[in-house]
Curated annotation (Swiss-Prot):
Belongs to the bacterial ribosomal protein bL20 family. Binds directly to 23S ribosomal RNA and is necessary for the in vitro assembly process of the 50S ribosomal subunit. It is not involved in the protein synthesizing functions of that subunit. GO terms for cellular component: ribonucleoprotein complex; ribosome. PANTHER family: 39S RIBOSOMAL PROTEIN L20. Keywords: Ribonucleoprotein, Ribosomal protein, RNA-binding, rRNA-binding. This is Large ribosomal subunit protein bL20. Transmembrane segments: none annotated. It comes from the Bacteria. GO terms for biological process: ribosomal large subunit assembly; translation. The lineage of its organism: Bacteria, Pseudomonadati, Pseudomonadota, Alphaproteobacteria, Acetobacterales.
Amino acid sequence: MARVKRGVTTHARHKKVLKQSKGFVGRSSTNYRIALERLEKALRYAYRDRRNKKREFRALWIQRINAAVREQGMTYSQFIAALKAANIELDRKVLAAMAFDDPAGFTAIVEAAKAVRG
């Protein structure tokens, strides 16, 4: 039986890791052993942060809405409760964008929410 040599597959695997670690600093991009560790850690961070990103953006939208609503004399929680009572189904992403890009439209929504609130 012939001896199996794995030089080709090993070389391909090393090349793949080094290609993915391109842009890392120092030996993290040139030395396979170090590059593999850095790449594994980078991929773990990427996986974690794809989930964190959703939380962080929601928090940012809430902060922006809160700041815009306070200028109109309401708090964020009062505003959201009034929106639900008025059956205005705009999500926080859209509300934050409106507060930033279309202040007049956002003011109209706040006034509609205030009217329902009483």
